[in-house]
Amino acid sequence: MKRFAAYDPPEYLEWTADPELMREYRARIDADPERAAVVRGLSEDALLAIYRGLLRNRLHDVALKRWVKSGVISKAWLGVGEEAVTIGPVHALRRAEPGRDVVAPMIRNAGACHEMGMPIAEIFRTYLGTGDGPSGGRDLHAGDLACGVLPPISNIGDVPPVIAGIALSFLQRGEDRVGMTWIGDGSTRNAGIHEAINFAGVRRLPVIFIIQNNQVALGTRVSVHSAGSFDDWPAMYGVAGGRFDGNHVLDAFAATRLAADHARAGEGATLLVTDTFRMGGHATHDEREARSLFDADTFRHWGQRDPVGMYEAWLEGEGVSRAALEAIEAEVTAEVDAGAQEALKSREESMPQGDTAELGVYATA
């Protein structure tokens, strides 16, 4: 895909696929027979839909960073380099009615919103706080329960108990639906997460937890804030477990599809663990400080494993033409640009009015 000197991490600007890494990428697909069967069962349309999702996620972040640099907004929380952890799992779920699953993203999993069916303009409107956005200008976290997206909660780590409750409702109603959420490595220090996973294990809830270890919590490396291995957690709580490559969208897809099948079969919760890397700052305001937390070799290591570039190279190896990929990129770029323009128009025409501030705060009897 096109690289943007003003917005992309420097490691991405001259990105080319490393032959050895691509051999590992292909081998990863076939390393587990169950996951291999899931991937090999995907149609070309499904594979290209995943590609569109990765592009949409990356270009969403590019648009936000463009807004920051041009003064439209003051900062943005981006998921550059972590797109596979979001897009693969979301595409493994049911994203339409009947029986739409429910996801509860962190702010860095914004791709879950548009891949579950929210128009991308709605996500941009949320950042701008417009009155016609999903929250009516009351929250900068995007979500829409009609699309199966529970908005993030500002208190880090408070979402897992909520998604566990949603999964409990599926179980009690006999609905063939699954809940899913992501947990950052830093968020694992929150007590509510442990309560949620324990409850899900005891009640055999149809829910998937993904520990998204991007190596850093705000400005604290995982080696400083956590001891032991997250791989031990599933056994601790008596739930199914697994690990996938956080920069490999197909491995993420397959692991999540199997976990969803496990839940739908009445076998209960799954805790998946994945390693990836935050290529920028906690938000756009601290990128320089964030890059001082790790040495240049670490950024090069993860930069060479760009999840969008790796998947694009894999698709070409599977016979998808460069022209076809470029056409898809042009379509998605136009979609994202149009969504950003719609949101900017809303900022001019549909900002929330002060006399509506108390509306929607309490439910009426």
Task: Give a label for each model feature.
Residues 1-85, 282, 288-365:
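Conserved acidic/glycine
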Residues 26-31, 129-131, 196-198, 276-278:
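Short acidic/polar alpha-helix capping motifs at helix-coil junctions
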Residues 113-115, 219, 282, 353:
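Short acidic, gly/pro-rich beta-turn/loop elements at beta-sheet edges
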Residues 47-49, 96-98, 135, 265-267:
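A generic structural signal for short, non-catalytic loop/turn and secondary-structure boundary residues
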Residues 65-203, 221-231, 236-238:
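Cofactor-binding active-site loop characterized by glycine-rich and histidine/acidic residues
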Residues 149-348:
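Glycine-rich ThDP/TPP pyrophosphate-binding loop and its adjacent helix/strand module
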